UniProtKB/Swiss-Prot annotation:
GO CC term, one of those recorded: cytoplasm
Matches recorded under PROSITE patterns: PROA
Species assigned in the record: Prochlorococcus marinus (strain NATL2A)
Protein family per UniProt: Belongs to the gamma-glutamyl phosphate reductase family.
This protein's name: Gamma-glutamyl phosphate reductase
Keyword set includes Protein biosynthesis: no
Length: 438
């Protein structure tokens, strides 16, 4: 997408939808924990009741998108199987079982007798979510929005339009049955609406883009609303020389082939030169049998990798069964390569040397840095967050998989009894600053 583009003003109809979402979000944010949990239960029930219609709509989307030439990785993300849908429904129920993120007192302090300060978590307000291909993302984000007391304007890709509409109909049915948050969730359906969303800074508190690098960059450059997200998912796995070869191959395979279209799948494998020959001799046939195309540097080509990796491959997110391989001298060279090419999403090291592992963990500045495990664990559900609205690679929090805690902010409450600053400025009164129990 070109950035030399003037984002149009939102239409009156879109402004009206945003106003309704804002009003509904205030009501939802003031609802009780029990009410929001009941709403999620009804949303899950409605999804389950309408599962056949949702899956039928998904087949229609898949058939149309395949005819239109949608690429393989996006088709993979678009597909919603019966098993995946059931997992999404279970995820909604698990979100309802998570601790209430609203109303948590983070600070409780006496400033002076009868002058008490509190810092308490509150909902953000309205989320603007733009996502491509994955209809399951709609379910995840909607459930987290409701649980955290936020409204949401959601725009999915046109390739998933029938699936998304069937899902939204079910979610809305659940909210109406629970009699809480009706109108808090709205599905945007046109490109004009998604562009207009970027100008709704009076109503939308956070934009969460989930899609291509181009999509994320375009949004970041064309809105005044805070943006949570990441562009590319260029993840690395480094195999050290102090390693169990079988363990390393197993972790590398899982990090690549378990779901290659995921943003937490590795795109580059770095191998210590001391064990490169042994690793590739055993690993190449296994990767080949799994249909993985390997592209290597000069050293790895000399050890059997058939395809050449050029400079652009080190910064490429394949989202497919393609893996770049580079042989490095040591952990320091691996770290330098990662610093140069990483998108700061997730990196991992396989080593039995704890000192080398700690060096890697403390030196790599990514949202997730792992030791002896697959990069595919970078996921809100696997972290125990219930689900995630997205993954943030920014340095400021929230960072990494963002669940409920990333969808609330805080507010300061100060309760007094006629207290005046002039009394403290004159010295007649003084601050006690005593921390009280939370």
């Amino acid at each position: 997408m070109s950035t030399n583009f003037s984002v149009p003003e939102p239409t009156p109809q879109l402004v009206k939808v945003a106003e309704s979402a804002k009003e509904a979000s205030i009501s939802l944010g003031q609802s009780t924990n029990k009410q929001r949990c009941e709403a999620l239960t009804e949303m899950a029930n409605a999804l389950n009741d309408n599962a056949d219609e949702i899956l039928k709509a998904n087949v229609q989307d898949l058939e149309r998108s395949e005819k239109e030439g949608l690429n393989k990785s996006l088709l993979s993300r678009l597909q919603l199987t019966k098993t995946k849908l059931k997992g999404c429904i279970d995820g909604v129920l698990k979100v309802s079982n998570l601790a209430d993120p609203i109303g948590k007192r983070q600070l409780h302090r006496e400033l002076n007798e009868n002058l008490i300060l509190e810092r308490v978590t509150v909902p953000l307000g309205v989320l603007g979510v733009i996502f491509e291909s994955r209809p399951d993302a709609l379910i995840q984000i909607a459930s987290l929005a409701v649980r955290s007391g936020n409204g949401a304007l959601l725009k999915g890709g046109s390739e998933a339009k029938d699936t998304n509409q069937a899902i939204m109909d079910s979610l809305d049915k659940g909210l109406r049955k629970a009699n809480v948050g009706s109108g808090a969730l709205s599905l945007l359906t046109t490109r004009q609406e998604s562009l207009g969303l970027l100008r709704l800074d009076k109503f939308v508190n956070l934009i969460i883009p989930r899609g291509s690098n181009e999509l994320v960059q375009f949004i970041q450059e064309n809105t005044r609303i805070p943006v949570l997200g990441h562009a590319d998912g260029i993840c690395h796995l480094y195999v050290d020389n102090s390693v169990d070869i079988d363990k390393a191959i197993s972790i590398a395979l899982d990090s690549k082939i378990q779901y290659p279209a995921a943003c937490n799948a590795i795109e580059t494998l770095l191998i210590h030169e001391d064990i490169a020959e042994m690793f590739l001799k055993k690993g190449l046939p296994i990767f080949s049998s799994e249909g993985v195309t390997l592209k290597g540097d000069t050293k790895s080509q000399a050890l059997g990798v058939k395809n050449k990796a050029d400079e652009s491959d080190w910064s490429k997110e394949y989202l497919d069964l393609i893996l770049s391989i580079k042989i490095v001298r040591n952990v320091n060279e691996a770290i330098e390569h990662i610093r140069k090419y990483s998108s700061r999403h997730t990196e991992a090291i396989v080593t039995e040397d704890k000192m080398v592992a700690e060096k890697f963990l403390s030196s790599v500045d990514s949202a997730g840095v792992y030791h002896n495990c697959s990069t595919r664990f970078a996921d809100g559900f696997r972290y125990g967050f219930g689900a995630e609205v997205g993954i943030s690679t920014q340095t400021l929090p929230p960072r990494g998989p963002v669940g409920l805690e990333g969808l609330v902010t805080y507010r300061y409450y100060l309760r007094g009894d006629g207290d005046l600053v002039k009394d403290f400025a004159s010295g007649d009164r003084s601050f006690s600053h005593i921390d009280l129990p939370l």
